[in-house]
Amino acid sequence: MKNWRLNNVTESAFEKTGPIPRSIAKTFEKFKKELEPNSESEIIEEFRVSRYQTASSIKYLVLLVTVPLLINQASKSLVFSPFIDYFWNDNQSDIFLNESQEERAFSELQRFEEKIHFEILIGQSPPLSQETIDKEIKNKAIELAQFYVQESTDAIKNLLADILAFITFAYLIFTGGRQIAVLKSFINELIYGLSDTAKAFLIILFTDIFVGFHSTHGWEVVLENGLRHFGLPENRDLIFLFIATFPVVLDTVFKYWIFRYLNQVSPSAVATYHEMNE
């Protein structure tokens, strides 16, 4: 890597905010450079740096996404899956990891039995003997048992594979100092290059998704699926407590960020945001 490239990227990536908004300062600096005699060579130099930043950032982003995913899937299929399946099937008699799985299984079995009786009563199914009904219920119970055994083993595999993928991701972040600086500079340039309307639109979209009026339903779905993914009990009190506190904290942090940082960097974007949000 050339030294001029790294120095340029590092200065841009860790540039501090001053009393003058960065959008105004960057515009004035750009106008000043265009008046200099060697402005043409500097423009070519900046274009090369920008092209290098874009290519390097995209490669690093692809690396951050694909490598942990590949590690996750490979370890889950080739390492954890055979070991856990062998241990669970041969040495473990339990079907469920938690009470939430039991409640769902019992509810499905009860609904299946009620469906059989309902179809017989309305004439959609021919009358069945109690022995036949018990046999169908038993087959359904065996099917549910196999399903929840698979769900339990998958949850353990998911936990171990995700931990390994997280360690891989953290290692890539920890060892990618130069790439992180380039990526940060690229993201800054990408954000500052957006129009004020686009910035305000993204801010409103982000806040409405994560801390908006309807965000509680989304958080509930995410938490339930996350707990189920790792085989943890779906505690409704814990879920509702999280929904009642975390979006509020996130909204407070976001408003502080607008007041403390974005108002200095791009005050016009903040003004546009307030106008669009009214």
Swiss-Prot record:
Claim: Transcription regulation is one of the keywords in the record: no
Membrane-spanning residues: 60-80, 163-183, 201-221, 239-259
Topology in the lipid bilayer: Multi-pass membrane protein
Top-level taxonomic group: Eukaryota
Catalysed transformations (reactions): K(+)(in) + H(+)(out) = K(+)(out) + H(+)(in)
An example Gene Ontology biological process: potassium ion transport
Main location: plastid
Keyword entries, A-Z: Antiport, Chloroplast, Hydrogen ion transport, Ion transport, Membrane, Plastid, Plastid inner membrane, Potassium, Potassium transport, Transmembrane, Transmembrane helix, Transport
Family: Belongs to the CemA family.
Location within or outside the cell: Plastid, Chloroplast inner membrane
Name of the protein in its database record: Potassium/proton antiporter CemA
InterPro entries linked: CemA
GO CC annotation terms, alphabetical: chloroplast inner membrane
GO molecular function: antiporter activity; proton transmembrane transporter activity
Role noted for this protein: Contributes to K(+)/H(+) antiport activity by supporting proton efflux to control proton extrusion and homeostasis in chloroplasts in a light-dependent manner to modulate photosynthesis. Prevents excessive induction of non-photochemical quenching (NPQ) under continuous-light conditions. Indirectly promotes efficient inorganic carbon uptake into chloroplasts.
